[in-house]
């Protein structure tokens, strides 16, 4: 576990924020440090964006924000911790909505309800994954990769950030649509998977942009495509996987959530302040440096999108054949 402490605060996720607090309490919020749980190892996209948001809140509100890394069990450990915390605005969750949605489809029994136990605070980003390969792999396009995988069934290994995570789902969806078989090697987070790709331990990783972009520029990793349905403005030269495999579309969403029953007034303050940060022209460049695009949304709009994503990703997880190790 690693914690980063900033002079400010952040929030987590819930379909209904039923409880309310006196107006003066909401206006004085926060009056003590806030803990922002990140269910991923340090060094990844979620960790980076959480620290940017935490730093902003601390500066604006004059309270510490502790960014608390709690990886494990495909984000379930961190999610459970937040779900069972009081809905008072002092325990928040920086979550990968796609992983949240995937878990809802993969696990028959979770220690929390992905909808009922969280309330939306603010969207943070949307970004493609990058279909990345080791330079030694003789494939320079998605079509060539599909042909190579068909010629070597079960012999080409891909790395992921863990079974049931978005990197795993992206690869398994690719396998199903392409009609190929590849070996899955799960790691404890995205950074170790990229390290394995650099070392040649695996041949393929569907990676976050920030984790592979420097290595793509240096030639140590070859990028073949983006996982979104359209080209990304961040990587305009890369075609979508869907150009070769119609229907392929995997988007990495990030969001701030809070425990259920967090008062609407507090959710509103958090949403307004985080959206104010993301509305700055300078923030667009910061997000782009992390390979992400800013997404601004109100809590009610977020809740609708969140439920749609859970339904979509649950279906993808089932159809792709992702299996828990």
Predicted regions and their residues:
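An extracytoplasmic/periplasmic, membrane-proximal ligand-sensing/linker region
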Residues: 31-33, 176-177, 217, 264-325
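A ligand-binding cleft/hinge motif common to bilobed small-molecule-binding domains
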Residues: 98-109, 168, 173-177, 204-237, ...
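Bacterial N-terminal signal peptides
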Residues: 4-15
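Short beta-strand->loop
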Residues: 113-123, 181-185, 203-204, 213-250, ...
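Residue-level signal for nonpolar/aromatic packing positions in well-ordered secondary structure
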Residues: 34-36, 43, 50, 67, ...
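Hinge/capping helix and adjacent helix->loop/strand transition within the periplasmic-binding protein
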Residues: 84-90, 97, 105-192, 241, ...
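N-terminal (or domain-start) structured segment
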Residues: 17-116, 155, 176-204, 208, ...
């Amino acid at each position: 576990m690693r914690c980063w402490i900033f002079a400010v605060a952040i929030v987590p996720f819930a379909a209904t924020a039923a409880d309310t607090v006196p107006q003066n309490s909401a206006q004085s919020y926060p009056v003590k440090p806030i803990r922002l749980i990140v269910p991923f190892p340090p060094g990844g996209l979620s960790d980076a964006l959480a620290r940017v948001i935490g730093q902003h809140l601390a500066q604006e509100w004059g309270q510490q924000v502790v960014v608390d890394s709690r990886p494990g069990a495909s984000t379930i450990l961190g999610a459970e911790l937040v779900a069972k915390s009081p809905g008072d605005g002092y325990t928040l969750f920086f979550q990968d909505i796609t992983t949240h949605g995937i878990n809802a489809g993969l696990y028959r029994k979770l220690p929390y309800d992905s909808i009922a136990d969280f309330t939306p605070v603010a969207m943070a980003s949307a970004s493609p994954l990058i279909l990345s390969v080791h330079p030694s792999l003789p494939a320079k396009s998605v079509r060539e990769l599909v042909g190579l995988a068909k010629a070597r069934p079960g012999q080409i290994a891909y790395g992921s950030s863990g079974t049931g995570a978005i990197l795993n789902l992206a690869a398994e969806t690719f396998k199903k649509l392409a009609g190929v078989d590849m070996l899955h090697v799960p790691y404890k987070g995205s950074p170790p998977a990229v390290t394995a790709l650099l070392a040649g331990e695996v041949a393929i990783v569907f990676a976050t942009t920030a984790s592979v972009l420097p290595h793509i520029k240096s030639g140590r990793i070859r990028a073949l495509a983006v996982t979104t349905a359209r080209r990304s403005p961040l990587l305009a030269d890369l075609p979508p996987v869907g150009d070769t495999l119609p229907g392929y579309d995997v988007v990495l969403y990030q969001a701030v959530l809070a425990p259920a029953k967090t008062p609407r007034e507090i959710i509103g303050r958090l949403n307004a302040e985080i959206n104010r940060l993301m509305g700055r022209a300078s923030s667009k460049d910061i997000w782009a440096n992390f390979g992400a695009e800013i997404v601004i949304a109100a809590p009610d709009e977020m809740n609708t999108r969140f439920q749609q994503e859970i339904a979509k990703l649950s279906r993808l997880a089932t159809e792709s054949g992702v299996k828990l190790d």
